[in-house]
């Protein structure tokens, strides 16, 4: 599906607007953990269901699907078996992103099955522009910039961390220790705890911190499970 380019700033504003609209409807201030399921059902007016999408689409790489005409977001129920809460919630937020950003493009070009036109989220399409946009929306929705920056000041420092080393280079017992790449799961966990991001994975958190320029990784080693801790 071809979709127009949208800037990060525009996507972030749409996520903020959705939270603010939900706050007005619900009558209380929303803080992390962001109640994405309630937002989908109450603010967007969609039905959220869980099905075995592998059987529906005949493929094991489908995480979710957004049916525009029937106003349904469907999440692969197998995520309950094989994934963390963070992955499940992020997928819900991702599909909400498709609804907010892309539903107007489905009528003509949407992929169809028995339920009508749908936007189908597949692992194999992860690098496609439409999937990147939905991923970025999900990150902005679950980890609002204001709350992230507040938590970062509590956990880390007023200024961004510049990371120059993959491993700890300071001798044990030294008072000062520079941040290093292999420390990222602990930084992410501390951020999730300090900011109340209990439904966000450590991997999603560390990506968000780098995107906002709060962690600047100057090494060639990525901050992820596969690269940092490979055998």
Briefly describe each language-model feature range:
Residues 1-231:
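Active-site hotspot residues in diverse enzymes, especially metal/ion-binding acidic/histidine motifs
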